[in-house]
């Protein structure tokens, strides 16, 4: 798995890093859109099976030790630290696995393991990195789009 991570990092993520920095994310119709090469990076990590490394197979994961995820994360960070921040959001899956209901696990963990979804809100003016003080609320529209409302 680490060889695969190294291959993706060296041959796709690192060569894309300058273009990602130059283009950057942007707003389009009120939605944040990643740089186009970021989407290439996400697609490459999905195709390589680099999502859900430490999750049980029954949820679509690879059931590898967290140490493997940590090493893979460092390899990706060496190629592009900004992209590593996006890719490593999947580590939030551990909280869902430990504290979510079985219904929540079945609903969300396979999608995260497939690299289809993941999000996190951490910083607000009065919260900083204190997650208990974050005021963000997420609501789902009828069309399935999530709306984030906070400070």
Regions found by a protein language model. Name each.
Residues 62, 103-151:
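Glycine-rich, Trp-frequent "lid" loop and neighboring beta-strands that shape
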Residues 29-37, 98, 115-119:
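Short, mixed-charge aromatic SLiMs
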Residues 1-83, 103, 107:
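Amphipathic, small/basic residue-rich leader segments at the start of a protein or domain
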Residues 45-46, 91-92, 140-141:
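Short hydrophobic "helix-edge" motifs at membrane interfaces and signal-peptide entry regions
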Residues 70, 93-94, 106, 146:
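Feature representing long, continuous alpha-helical segments
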Residues 49-52, 82-85, 117-119, 145-146:
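Beta-sheet entry/capping signal
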Residues 84-102:
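N-terminal glycine-rich flavin-associated loop
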């Amino acid at each position: 798995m680490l060889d695969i991570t190294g291959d993706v990092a060296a041959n796709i993520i690192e060569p894309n890093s300058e273009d990602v920095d130059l283009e950057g994310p942007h707003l389009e119709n009120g939605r944040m859109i990643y740089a186009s090469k970021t989407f290439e990076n996400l697609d490459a990590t999905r195709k390589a099976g680099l999502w859900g490394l430490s999750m049980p197979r029954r949820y679509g994961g690879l059931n590898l030790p967290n140490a493997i995820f940590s090493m893979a994360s460092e390899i990706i960070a060496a190629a592009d630290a900004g992209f590593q921040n996006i890719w490593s959001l999947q580590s939030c899956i551990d909280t869902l696995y430990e504290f979510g209901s079985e219904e929540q696990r079945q609903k969300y963990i396979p999608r995260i393991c497939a690299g289809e979804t993941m999000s996190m809100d951490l910083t607000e003016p009065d919260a900083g990195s204190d997650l208990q003080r974050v005021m963000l609320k997420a609501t789902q529209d009828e069309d399935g789009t999530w709306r984030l409302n906070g400070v």
